[in-house]
């Protein structure tokens, strides 16, 4: 089997394994009494991670350079990063719920790379002179790892918002998610049926008395789940943000060496800055401003869209120095 055939086998295998693993995690969430499913899910993600690593290694041997120079390679590197961050988050949190939201994204990335990209974008090609630099591995790999971590953290925030929908959740204790939650019931004021009373002059008057109606509260199990999701989200974003910062700085140094300017407001650079600002605002709100509960989760959830626009949306528009030029 030559390297090209091996790569085709590995990319299809990684997609199939992630698809089956996604079904296992969903089944485990629907039927938590089945003890075998969580272990199968973790094993599936580990196998997919190894398959993608082997694919990237084969690509490296075939092309002779670190395989992150085109969209196909970067998508698989991103999928590898998502599965790696998943394994770290799952191990540290001891929660099998991580895979419920991360495996669909990892599977979707591999499906897009394997099934949707044109054939010419899946083949390796010699590097252009501008990319023949050690900064390629330093800058791009760190940026892709930061995207993976920030995506996983944002997914945990989205899951937190779903679990706590319709409720006002606040975190007691430190901002790192180690305290317990308290639930503030949302009370709505309504008017009871009128009570008619006779007045002194023989007439009648209607008395309207307000009543308080409390919304349904979360169960203790859901409160514990919300705490776990918030904790994972905060810690994973705390991992991805320094990587994003390092990646942006490395890119600026590389740009100065290649084009004589640290920053040129290329669309990719602009959206990288927007991504940095969104997650900087999230961490600032959590650490300094004391935001807790749903408000910072909404900010983190919006970062999921921002990361995808920065990584894929700008690249596919065919504009700027970072374009893959597929749509235009």
UniProtKB/Swiss-Prot annotation:
Subcellular location: Cellular thylakoid membrane
Membrane keyword on record: yes
Pfam families: Cytochrom_C_asm (PF01578)
Predominant subcellular localization, coarse grouping: membrane
GO molecular function: heme binding
Listed GO CC annotations: plasma membrane-derived thylakoid membrane
Membrane topology summary: Multi-pass membrane protein
Gene Ontology process terms (BP): cytochrome complex assembly
Keywords assigned by UniProt, alphabetized: Cytochrome c-type biogenesis, Membrane, Thylakoid, Transmembrane, Transmembrane helix
InterPro entries: Cyt_c_assembly, Cyt_c_biogenesis_CcsA, Cyt_c_biogenesis_CcsA/CcmC
UniProt entry tagged with the keyword Glycoprotein: no
PANTHER family xrefs: CYTOCHROME B_B6 PROTEIN-RELATED, HEME EXPORTER PROTEIN C
Function: Required during biogenesis of c-type cytochromes (cytochrome c6 and cytochrome f) at the step of heme attachment.
Subunit structure: May interact with ccs1.
Family according to the record: Belongs to the CcmF/CycK/Ccl1/NrfE/CcsA family.
Protein name according to UniProt: Cytochrome c biogenesis protein CcsA
Species of provenance: Microcystis aeruginosa (strain NIES-843 / IAM M-2473)
Originating gene: ccsA
């Amino acid at each position: 089997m030559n390297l090209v055939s091996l790569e085709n086998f590995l990319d299809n295998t990684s997609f199939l394994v992630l698809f089956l693993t996604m079904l296992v995690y969903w089944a485990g969430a629907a039927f938590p009494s089945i003890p075998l499913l969580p272990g199968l899910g973790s094993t599936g993600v580990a196998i997919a991670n190894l398959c993608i690593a082997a694919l990237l290694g084969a690509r490296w041997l075939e092309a002779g350079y670190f395989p992150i120079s085109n969209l196909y390679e970067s998508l698989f590197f991103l999928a590898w990063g998502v599965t790696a961050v998943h394994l770290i988050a799952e191990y540290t949190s001891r929660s099998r719920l991580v895979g419920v939201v991360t495996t669909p994204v990892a599977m979707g990335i591999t499906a897009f790379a394997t099934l949707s990209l044109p054939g010419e974008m899946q083949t390796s090609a010699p590097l252009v002179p501008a990319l023949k630099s050690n900064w390629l591995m330093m800058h791009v790999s760190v940026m892709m790892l930061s995207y993976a971590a920030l995506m996983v953290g944002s997914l945990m925030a989205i899951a937190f918002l779903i679990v706590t929908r319709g409720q006002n959740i606040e975190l007691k204790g430190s901002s790192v998610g180690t305290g317990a939650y308290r639930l503030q019931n949302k009370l709505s004021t309504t008017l009871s049926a009128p009570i008619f009373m006779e007045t002194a002059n023989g007439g009648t008057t209607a008395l309207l008395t307000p009543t308080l109606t409390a919304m349904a509260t979360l169960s203790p199990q859901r409160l514990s789940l919300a705490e776990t999701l918030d904790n994972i989200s905060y810690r994973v974003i705390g991992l991805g943000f320094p990587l994003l910062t390092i990646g942006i700085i490395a890119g600026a140094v590389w740009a100065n060496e290649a084009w004589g300017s640290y920053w040129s407001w290329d669309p990719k650079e602009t959206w990288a800055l927007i991504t940095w600002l969104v997650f900087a605002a999230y961490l600032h709100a959590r650490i300094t401003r004391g935001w807790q509960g749903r408000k910072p989760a909404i900010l983190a959830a919006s970062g999921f869209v921002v990361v995808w626009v920065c990584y894929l949306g700008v690249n596919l528009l065919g504009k700027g120095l970072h374009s893959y030029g597929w749509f235009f």
